[in-house]
């Protein structure tokens, strides 16, 4: 067992590193800090308080307290992981029909085994183990499985229970939960953030009113109307989302894989975001926004989609407050980030384009006007998120059917001519976008670049070589 990390956010950390308090998705700097703490403790216990060497092998480290803990920092290979993910999915298809599999992420699937157990003569644990064994023999990769009477319990069984039980001789961990065993085992479990769909924000709100466990939430949901702790308190905190939280506190989940497959959202959005590798000033961050718009709009064109609204969120860097000069100059609101550090409150706004479009020109004009209006020019930027809302198929754009009051002073012929000219320009732009997409698909995303992509600080060229923000 080796101590292994993937920069910059850990996609995975080995169980060996987990033993030293490093979480699964720690930032690399957090992992470095935790390793320093671990080595300080090892040095205190080492013979003569000196290290004689280093090791990243857990067994060797356990046997030799005089060795300093080290670790391997491995660069992610997302294309390689996706290839293996596809291979594993195809193994599942040997046992399960695709309509009974929901791909949740690159390394997780939900499977409905209900209709397969009687015909196979196996119980759920045996069936899961057979598939896991096939994956191991075919790919050399082991797996962890959670079995539950619904999707929520299966997920929690894997995330919380399976990861805390000993593995078998092949490294396989399988855990099972039903509603009653969930309540017995996990109603007192902490922290709440270990549970599916409970983030830091939810946990903080719950803890502020004295609710620290799923058992607390379940008890609160059955409180009397004149009690402080009752379901009204939860609905006041979370609105309609309290219904899902209450269900999960009791181990209930009505949604099935069939429901997931049939679901069609009322509204669609497409977005992208990035954390800059260093703080950017106003103008350099504006360049990144232009690049992100360009890629976002090309994605819309490729999918035959259009939008009429863009949402922009700009997060500021901690240096704005850690630098005494900058802090003295800043007079705005201050918030705390997920690491407990003070930062200026982020900028957030919406640009309404006025028509459904996938025009780079129209979207860029609208978003840059918004950026110039909401972003503090004196602050350093660290995070950018752009989302296209109300996304629909181009063929579904509603036809204009507006009634207009005519007057004697407007040149309607000139207006019509202007409209025709604008439509012709948009059509030319679309043909150019489609040509760009054709070239990129044939020769690679960096086969054709704009001048802005070569400016100092531009990130599009590097990001084109990534998958999901990680090296391909």
Q: What is the meaning of each model-derived region?
A:
Residues 194, 202-381, 401:
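DNA-contacting surface of Y-family translesion DNA polymerases
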Residues 3, 143-147, 308-312, 382-385:
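A short glycine-rich, hydrophobically flanked beta-strand micro-motif that places a catalytic Asp/Glu
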Residues 340-472:
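Acidic, metal-coordinating catalytic segment for phosphate/diphosphate chemistry
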Residues 9-257, 413-472:
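Gly/Gly-Pro- and Ser/Thr-rich, intrinsically disordered tail segments characteristic of DNA damage-repair
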Residues 149, 316-318, 390-392:
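Glycine-rich beta-alpha junction loops
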Residues 1-11:
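Short, small-residue-biased leader/transition segments that mark boundaries at the very start
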Residues 174-177, 192, 270, 351, ...:
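Short clusters of hydrophobic/aromatic residues that line enzyme substrate/ligand-binding pockets
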């Amino acid at each position: 067992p080796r101590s292994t990390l993937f920069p910059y956010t850990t996609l995975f950390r080995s169980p060996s590193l987990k033993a030293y308090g490093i979480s699964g998705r720690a930032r690399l700097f957090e992992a470095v800090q935790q390793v320093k703490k671990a080595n300080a403790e090892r040095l205190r216990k080492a013979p003569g308080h000196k290290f004689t060497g280093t090791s990243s092998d857990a067994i060797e480290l356990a046997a030799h307290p005089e060795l300093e803990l080290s670790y391997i920092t491995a660069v992610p290979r997302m294309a390689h992981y996706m290839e293996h993910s596809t291979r594993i999915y195809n193994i599942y298809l040997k046992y399960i029909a695709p309509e009974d599999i929901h791909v949740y992420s690159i390394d997780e699937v939900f499977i409905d085994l209900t209709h397969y157990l009687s015909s196979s003569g196996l119980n759920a644990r045996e069936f899961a183990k057979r598939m896991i064994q096939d994956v191991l023999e075919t790919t050399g990769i082991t797996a962890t499985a959670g079995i539950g009477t619904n999707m929520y319990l299966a997920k929690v069984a894997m995330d919380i229970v399976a990861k805390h039980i000993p593995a078998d001789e092949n490294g396989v961990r399988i855990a099972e939960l039903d509603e009653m065993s969930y309540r017995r085992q996990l109603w007192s479990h902490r922290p709440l953030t270990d549970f599916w769909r409970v983030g830091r924000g939810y946990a903080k709100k719950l803890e502020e009113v004295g609710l620290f466990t799923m058992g607390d939430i379940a008890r609160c949901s059955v409180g009397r109307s004149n009690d402080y702790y009752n379901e009204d308190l939860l609905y006041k905190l979370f609105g309609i989302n309290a219904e899902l939280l209450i269900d999960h506190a009791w181990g209930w989940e009505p949604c099935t894989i069939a429901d997931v497959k049939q679901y069609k959202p009322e509204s669609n959005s497409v977005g992208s975001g990035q954390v800059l590798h260093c703080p950017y000033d106003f103008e350099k961050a504006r360049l990144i926004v232009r690049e992100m718009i360009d890629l976002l709009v090309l994605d819309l064109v490729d999918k035959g989609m259009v939008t009429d609204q863009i949402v922009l969120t700009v997060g500021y860097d901690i240096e704005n407050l850690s630098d005494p000069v900058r802090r003295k100059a800043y007079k705005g609101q201050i918030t705390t980030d997920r690491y407990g550090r003070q930062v200026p409150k982020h900028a957030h706004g919406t640009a309404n384009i006025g028509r459904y479009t996938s025009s780079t020109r129209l979207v860029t004009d609208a978003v840059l006007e918004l950026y110039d209006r909401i972003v503090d020019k004196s602050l350093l930027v660290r995070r950018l998120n752009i989302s296209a809302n109300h996304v629909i198929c181009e063929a579904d754009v509603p036809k204009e059917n507006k009634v207009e009051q005519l007057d004697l002073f407007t040149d309607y012929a000139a207006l019509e001519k202007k409209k025709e000219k604008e439509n012709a320009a948009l059509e030319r732009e679309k043909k150019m976008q489609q040509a760009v997409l054709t070239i990129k698909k044939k020769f690679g995303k960096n086969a054709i670049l704009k001048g802005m992509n070569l400016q100092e600080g531009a990130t599009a060229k590097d990001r084109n070589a990534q998958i999901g923000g990680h090296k391909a």
